[in-house]
Structure formats: structure tokens, C-alpha cells
Regions:
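Active-site-adjacent structural patch at catalytic or cofactor/ligand-binding sites
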Residues: 39-42
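Hydrophobic membrane-insertion alpha-helices, especially the h-region
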Residues: 5-22
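Mature, soluble, non-transmembrane domains
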Residues: 89-172
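N-terminal hydrophobic targeting signals that begin at the initiator methionine
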Residues: 1-3
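Alpha-helical transmembrane signal-anchor/signal-peptide segments
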Residues: 25-37
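Extracytoplasmic/periplasmic/luminal assembly and interaction segments
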Residues: 50-90
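Short, hydrophobic/aromatic-rich segments at coil-to-beta transitions
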Residues: 26, 45-51
Length: 172
């Protein structure tokens, strides 16, 4: 009897450890104030994504492009059609500017984030996430399908355990 109890106990401990080990890398969205995981999107090193939002003043799309680099988010480019509040006004060392097809493109280098704060638009709520995973077709997800308009979220690259994957909402 003691042997069965010992085996069951060791098995339970192994299962608990297994489901709590960091396992899969993902782009994780946490509620800004509580840091509770709201949604995640599996992303590997080198996968890319764009965040597209409508500028609240001139009501045109702004695209920010990122690449997953290790446990960080690397910003690559900002694309917009009009200058305005919050838009880059000058090119800094290491950046490259290009005006193409009626759009301003600012290519940046060496801009890395451990995490970023993003507010889902409230007045003009049309934020989109364009997913560019290697070996898959590009797809676009609407923020409002996962997030409350007007709320803010901390976005980071994390290794999630099986437990976190099971209880979280995968963005599809």
C-alpha cells in the first residue's frame, strides 16, 4: 500500500511540474492594471507581426511592424500617410526614411522592447494585428474580438506553460 501511495504521489508531483514548466513561446497580452493574461499568440523567433491602428486625429491607418527576437519585440518600421500628433517628425541616426506609394515609411534599427503598452482604441476602435509566421499565410485579427475598447494591455514575448496555454485565449 505504501508503495502505491508513493508512486501516486511522485506521479502527481511530476504531472504538476510538467504542466507548469515554460514550454511554448508566445506574444502575450496582459491586462494593463492587473497583469492578468487576456490572450496569447504562439510566435517563434523571427516571426513578425504588424499592429495597425487608426490615428485618432487624421483618421488614417498607421502601421507599426515588429519581429520576435529572442524574448524581445524588435520594432522594424512605422508607416503612415499624414504627419500629425504622435507621428515621427524627424529621422534619427540609424533610421531610414522613404516616401513610397503615398505613404511615409520610417525604418528603425536596434529598437527592442521587453514589453510594450498598447491601448485598444475607444473612440476610433479599429486596431488590427497582422500575423506573419514563417510557413503560414499572413492573417489579420481584430483587437475588438479579444480586447475591450479603451483598455490598455502590456504586450511581451513569454514562454508559457501548458497550464497557461490551457487556461488562456489563443488568438486565431
Amino acid at each position: 500500500m505504501k508503495k502505491i501511495v508513493s508512486i501516486l504521489f511522485i506521479s502527481a508531483v511530476c504531472i504538476i511540474l510538467f504542466i507548469n514548466l515554460p514550454w511554448k513561446q508566445a506574444l502575450v497580452f496582459e491586462e494593463g492594471r492587473t497583469k492578468q493574461q487576456v490572450a496569447y499568440l504562439p510566435m517563434a523567433d523571427g516571426d513578425a507581426f504588424d499592429i495597425i491602428f487608426v490615428h485618432s486625429i487624421h483618421l488614417t491607418d498607421v502601421t507599426e511592424s515588429y519581429v520576435v527576437t529572442g524574448q524581445q519585440i524588435e520594432q522594424k518600421m512605422i508607416r503612415f500617410s499624414q504627419y500629425g500628433i504622435g507621428m515621427p517628425a524627424e529621422v534619427h541616426e540609424g533610421e531610414r526614411y522613404e516616401y513610397k506609394d503615398g505613404m511615409h515609411h520610417l525604418y528603425v534599427n536596434d529598437v527592442y522592447f521587453d514589453s510594450m503598452n498598447i491601448r485598444n482604441g475607444k473612440t476610433v476602435s479599429n486596431h488590427r494585428l497582422v500575423v506573419k509566421r514563417r510557413g503560414e499565410r499572413e492573417r489579420q485579427l481584430q483587437f475588438n474580438d479579444y480586447f475591450v475598447p479603451g483598455d490598455w494591455y502590456a504586450v511581451s514575448i513569454q514562454k508559457l506553460s501548458l497550464w497557461q496555454l490551457w487556461r488562456g485565449v489563443e488568438m486565431r
